[in-house]
């Protein structure tokens, strides 16, 4: 069978799904202890009884959650040589109408490489996700935005991490001065949506939250046409 599952395994999964939906919606935590505590996250070691009666030890990274900013420049580009779009050919005008996405490039030690990413950061204690999004965009890029909309909310890696990410769409951008943290060395650049989508699909962009945001915008733009 697919994925090497036997009929019994399929039956067991079906029982777990049914029990999760009707009898046991969450695991019963039998014991929990903090096995690591750091400035950004902690780790708990939990003894649990999960849906279907499975008992297991789970090490879970605990995180306060993060935000991601999909900052879009809809006034993509005025032509420095000719501001009269009425006399520009239709293909050039179409290119001008394409939105641009603000990306950051920085070194990521865990990935051992430079990465293109959307602006993002952790939600501090006492902050709302929107407040954190506005703060991170300004700190990392120097931009502020007049329009904000929450578009996506998801778990990063729910097998061992409880962190969620919320992506905000930011429009009406206004340039300012970046205020990065001392250990942040960030370069920023605008990419046309079509180019950013190619980068997401050909592997040049390898960051999951960034790929999610870019493909959301590409799909939304396509549906609006």
Where are these regions (language model features)?
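Conserved hydrophobic/aromatic beta-strand scaffold that supports enzyme active sites
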Residues: 40-47, 103, 167-169, 188-190
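Extreme N-terminal tail/first-helix region
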Residues: 12-37
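Long hydrophobic alpha-helical segments typical of transmembrane helices together
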Residues: 197-225
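Acidic, metal-coordinating catalytic segment for phosphate/diphosphate chemistry
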Residues: 31-75
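Acidic pyrophosphate-coordinating catalytic loop
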Residues: 34-37, 109, 154-164, 222
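N-terminal amphipathic/basic-hydrophobic helices that include classical n-h-c signal peptides
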Residues: 1-15
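Unchanged
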Residues: 56, 67-68, 96, 122-208
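Conserved Nudix-box catalytic region and its N-terminal flanking loop in Nudix hydrolases
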Residues: 23-24, 58-61, 79-135, 139, ...
């Amino acid at each position: 069978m697919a994925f090497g599952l036997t009929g019994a395994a399929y039956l067991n999964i079906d029982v777990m799904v049914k029990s999760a939906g009707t009898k046991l919606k969450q695991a019963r935590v039998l014991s929990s202890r903090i096995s690591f505590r750091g400035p950004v996250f902690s780790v708990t070691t939990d003894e649990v009884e999960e849906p279907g009666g499975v008992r297991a030890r789970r090490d879970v990274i605990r995180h306060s959650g993060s935000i991601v900013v999909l900052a879009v420049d809809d006034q993509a580009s005025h032509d420095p040589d000719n501001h009269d779009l009425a006399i520009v050919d239709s293909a050039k005008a179409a290119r001008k109408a394409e939105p641009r996405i603000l990306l950051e490039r920085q070194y990521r030690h865990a990935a051992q490489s430079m990465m293109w990413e959307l602006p993002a950061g952790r939600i501090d204690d006492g902050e709302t996700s929107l407040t954190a999004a506005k703060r991170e965009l300004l700190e990392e890029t120097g931009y502020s935005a007049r329009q904000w909309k929450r578009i996506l909310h998801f778990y990063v890696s729910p097998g061992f991490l409880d962190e969620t990410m919320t992506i905000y769409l930011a429009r009406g951008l206004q340039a300012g001065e970046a205020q990065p943290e001392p250990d942040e060395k960030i370069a920023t650049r605008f990419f046309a949506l079509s180019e950013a989508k190619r980068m997401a699909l050909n592997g040049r962009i390898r960051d999951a939250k960034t790929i999610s945001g870019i493909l959301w915008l590409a799909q939304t733009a396509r549906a609006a046409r």
